[in-house]
Structures are given as structure tokens and as C-alpha cells.
């Protein structure tokens, strides 16, 4: 499979990831019981987006010197298209986390710890999924058509509003954990496990961590096939995907109070998934330039945001 990735690019990228995770951890470290403010979350969200943009710019400069302007332009547009796609799909992930935290009544201080581990787990799992997916696409090109059909199906579900309400207690993995593990009835600070009468017990916080990780695995099933419609280069898929999820902690606290205000987001995501799925299904018939995909994603997200703002204003005046 053709890729611009080499050892030094991967080392540089994961070096940036490690440094930014440390900065994120130290920057978001709050005093016990102190909540993350909307202002602080907004600053960190802007910082993460800025890092993603700067990485894209640095990638373009590097590729311009090594492989030429034409390929540099193409790969950079693929990166930004993939980043926007993954960032928009990640918003739905945030809403599920809100539901999980609300169901377990976790305070903000514990949410920060869970999300830190959640993002770290997502980095490992998504990296694994991406390279497995890249291998499948290289060895079995027909897999792209399965991805395309699945994305079209998911897009229709978004448009028809079939994102049904989920009762946390009905989730199978939670039932299995409660049945096969010793779970304490209450939290014990920020501990995942405690010893009682010589036996190891898991706390409800451990259940929350498992649900957060499981939800990301489920959403990765949507998002990773979608980005393979934008590019088949595993380096671009990986960097765009991880850059999008690295800022999820800040995005979570920023959107925590605005979940109900993004009224038209599911419809916008549905349209984008339909577009991406159709593009995959028509690979052998029509090759769509990457700038069209990038422009389409930007326009749909902009229209979605505009319509949501109008909807909110109408509700305020009604």
C-alpha cells in the first residue's frame, strides 16, 4: 500500500502525541473538587485544533521538500478532510460519555480521570484498528464496498433519527461485569479497585471506564471506515484520527452544557456519512478529487451549525 509514512515521520508524530498528552494532563490538573470551566475547556479545545492545524502545515512543508508540491497538496488535503470528518463524528461520542457519567452520577474530578484513561485507551485501540483495516484494504480491496454499504446504512439511521435511547443498565457488557465481578455498591474516591476482607473488588468507577472504552470501540466502527473513503494511506488515516480524538477531553467539557443545542448535528453527520459511503461504492466508476470531499464536509458542518443556531434563537423567542 502506498504511503508517505516512514520511520521518522511516525517517531515525530508519536513524539508530538506524547508531549501533548503530558501538557494536557498537567494543564487540566485541577484541585480536588474544582470543576473545569467552560472558558478553560474552550482554550484547550482551541489549543488542540491549533496543534492539528500546525501539524498539517508542517506535514505539507516536509512533503513539499521530499515528494513535490502536487503530492504534498493532495496528502495535506486528505489529512484535513480526514481530521474534520473524525472530529465531527467524535462529537457523538462525547454525547454518549455524557449519558454514561450522568447515569453513574460521577463528579467532574472523576470524569477528568476517566477521560484521560479513555483517550489513552482510544489511542492504542484505534492505532491497532487502523493498521488492521489498512491490511484488509490492501489484501482484500472489496472490503471498501462493505465499508461503503455500512456507512450508507449508518447515514440513513442518522437521518431517520434511529439513534434510540439506551438504558445503561440494559447494556450487555455491564450486565456481564456485574455478574462475573465483585463490584462495590459505592465509589471509593478515585480508585478502580479496593481490597475488602482480603478480596479484590472493582468499584463503579471501573465500570464507567469500561463503558467509556467500549463506546469508543463502537464509534470507531463508524469513523475508521469513513476515513478510509478519504484516503487509503495508513499514515494519513492514523494522524488525522488521533489528532481528532486527542482533544476529546477538552471537547467533552466544552460541549457538556451544549449537548441539546446542536439540534441538527445528527442530520449533518448522516449526510456526510451518506456522501462518504456513496463515494466508496462508486470507487470504480468515478474518482472524486479530494478537494471536493473536503469542501463538502466543511459546507455541511457549516450549514448544520447555522441551522442549529437559528433553531436555538427561535426557541428563545417562542
What is the predicted role of each segment?
Residues 1-318:
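Multi-pass alpha-helical transmembrane bundle typical of ion/small-solute transporters
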Amino acid at each position: 500500500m502506498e504511503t508517505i509514512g516512514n520511520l521518522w515521520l511516525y517517531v515525530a508524530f508519536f513524539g508530538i502525541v506524547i508531549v501533548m498528552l503530558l501538557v494536557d494532563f498537567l494543564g487540566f490538573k485541577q484541585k480536588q473538587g474544582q470543576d473545569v470551566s467552560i472558558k478553560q475547556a474552550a482554550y484547550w479545545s482551541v489549543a488542540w485544533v491549533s496543534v492539528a492545524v500546525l501539524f498539517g502545515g508542517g506535514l505539507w512543508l516536509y512533503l513539499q521538500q521530499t515528494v513535490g508540491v502536487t503530492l504534498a497538496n493532495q496528502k495535506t488535503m486528505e489529512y484535513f478532510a480526514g481530521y474534520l470528518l473524525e472530529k465531527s463524528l467524535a462529537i457523538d461520542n462525547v454525547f454518549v460519555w455524557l449519558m454514561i457519567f450522568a447515569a453513574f452520577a460521577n463528579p467532574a474530578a472523576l470524569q477528568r480521570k476517566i477521560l484521560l484513561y479513555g483517550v489513552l485507551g482510544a489511542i492504542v485501540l484505534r492505532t491497532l484498528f487502523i493498521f488492521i483495516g489498512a491490511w484488509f484494504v490492501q489484501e482484500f480491496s472489496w472490503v471498501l464496498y462493505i465499508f461503503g454499504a455500512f456507512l450508507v446504512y449508518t447515514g440513513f439511521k442518522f437521518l431517520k433519527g434511529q439513534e434510540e435511547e439506551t438504558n445503561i443498565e440494559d447494556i450487555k457488557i455491564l450486565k456481564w461485569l456485574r455478574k462475573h465481578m465483585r463490584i462495590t455498591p459505592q465509589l471509593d474516591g478515585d480508585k478502580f479497585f479496593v481490597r475488602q476482607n482480603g478480596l479484590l473488588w472493582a468499584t463503579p468507577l471501573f465500570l464507567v471506564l469500561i463503558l467509556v472504552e467500549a463506546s469508543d470501540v463502537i464509534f470507531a466502527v463508524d469513523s475508521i471506515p469513513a476515513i478510509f473513503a478519504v484516503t487509503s494511506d495508513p499514515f494519513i488515516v492514523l494522524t488525522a484520527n488521533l489528532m481528532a480524538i486527542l482533544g476529546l477531553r477538552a471537547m467533552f467539557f466544552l460541549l457538556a452544557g451544549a449537548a441539546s443545542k446542536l439540534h441538527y448535528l445528527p442530520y449533518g453527520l448522516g449526510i456526510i456519512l451518506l456522501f462518504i459511503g456513496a463515494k466508496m461504492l462508486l470507487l470504480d466508476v468515478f474518482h472524486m478529487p479530494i478537494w471536493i470531499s473536503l469542501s463538502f464536509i466543511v459546507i455541511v458542518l457549516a450549514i448544520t451549525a447555522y441551522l442549529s443556531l437559528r433553531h436555538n434563537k427561535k426557541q428563545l423567542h417562542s
